[in-house]
Amino acid sequence: MCLVSQEMRKLAPELDPLRIGTGWKKEDLGKVQVMVESTYGDSHPGSGHLNILVEEVRKGIAEEGGFGARYFCTDICDGESQGTDGINYSLASREMIANMIEIHANATPFDAGVYLSSCDKGVPGNIMGLARVNIPSVFVPGGTMNAGPEMLTLEQLGMYSAQYERGEIDEEKLDWAKCNACPSCGACSFIGTASTLQIMAEALGLALPGSALMPATSPDLLEYAKEAGRQSVRLAKMKNMKPSDIVTMESFENAILVHAAISGSTNCLLHLPAIAHELGIEITGDTFDRLHRNARYLLDVRPAGRWPAECFYYAGGVPAIMEEIKQHLHLDVMTVTGKTLGENLEELKNNGFYEKCDKWLQEFNKRYNINLTKNDIIRSYDNAIGTDGSIAILKGNLAPEGAVIKHTACPEEMFKSVLHARPFDSEEECLDAVLKHKVQKGDAVFIRYEGPKGSGMPEMFYTSEAISSDKELGKSIALITDGRFSGASTGPVIGHCSPEAVDGGPIALVEEDDLIEIDVMERKLNIVGVNGERKSMEEIDEILKERRAKWTPRKPKYEKGVLRLFSQHAASPMKGAYLDY
């Protein structure tokens, strides 16, 4: 067994004394050396507890005869920066996390890695980093927070805030929601981007079976972290067990089918393609659309369903979802256990995993005085909530490269409609118009110049919540943007409209009272009229040519710093919006 760490010790005589100065003992220097990288920090509840898991990982590494070194690059929280210019840094932060992992792993020699994170950009940033570094690796999901009183979860704050702005609730009720929505550490308790990406990590075969999205307060999570440490040392001693050996196109297809089954966040269409890019695999929006068609949607968890995210684990987690859709999965793909996916699923049936999950479900039932069963949370294949996946890629003269809609969270009344365009060049203007009812039934509200190159691709969460929580507007208008949406977003919202406005995409050419055709089942998104009147598609093409000739590109929004770099080099949202140097 040839260890990179030991070869480098021969080349760099300063390495040993520097590590001893960091707290290593002489006997540690010759062991398998594992980088334990996490997003631990006080940035948000999803990262605040990871130091505890890091120490469990290190214990597991030590038990298997290795030594674990701690490295940190904390992430930011979309929720904390929501509605401010801070949200513009969110997607770019994913790239910076991946870059720091590359730097940490390549500047100092390691034989394996364990990566811990919980949330929106921390999880994909870590997975992109581990794929780029490509040493034997295990990912540890940080789990989900518990629900609060009355089963309150954070994604409901947008609704409460909009209700308060409209005078429907008082300040006391809003304050109650704020003080109770996040009662513990962990990712927010709904199938948003954080939860979706934890699930994707396991579905790709990079996390231990059954480890995704368990409650962050559970003692089970500590044991999973310790076992991940043990497994990293084992992987370092095995051949052909690097991330590039484990994760294949078939692995991504499995993950996307799981994404369909859970009605996962639309932000996954940014993250899985970016991860795939690091591995030399091409995943696009079209890949998602192909696999979501006729796929079973099974998970009755918020925001599209009824229950908080902790219930996902109580119902059996990723393995239970995979068992239901097993006939469509590639069961021969390799995983970090050193076994195939099929072998892992069979082992879980016999090792008490499902019995343990059910025990936690009974505890949850007692807490809220209800009587949920596994099938109330994860439907059977034959009793699916839906049979056409959960997202669709719409294309047409408004989005030649595509735009994404989560149709499982959209009122069916909006699946096929022709609306009147109301374009805005900032979210602030649009939100003000929605809250003051300056938009009306039958409008298609546009927020543009918010793509990766435009402003960093922030979320349009407050505007989408203001629309979906309005009893009239939520079923009668649509929001279309080249930006993105929170994983908590619901309603008739269409994002990632590509090409983006700053690149001269058709969304930049939309004018007041254009007629906008949305057809979810036919996957269409078109401008079909101007000034409120229908036109032929040939006429529309000529009108768009005339508008393009008059269109003037905007000056770059950022003149320096990270966002200048990101806006100059970001790829299309349909390819993952990664830094394409």
Residue ranges and their predicted role:
Residues 91-94, 98:
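Well-ordered mid-protein domain cores that form the structural environment of catalytic cofactors
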Residues 1-46, 53-73, 79, 85-90, ...:
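Catalytic or ion-coupling anion/metal-binding cores of large enzyme and transporter domains
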Residues 105-126, 138-141:
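A short, small-residue-rich loop immediately preceding and capping a beta-strand
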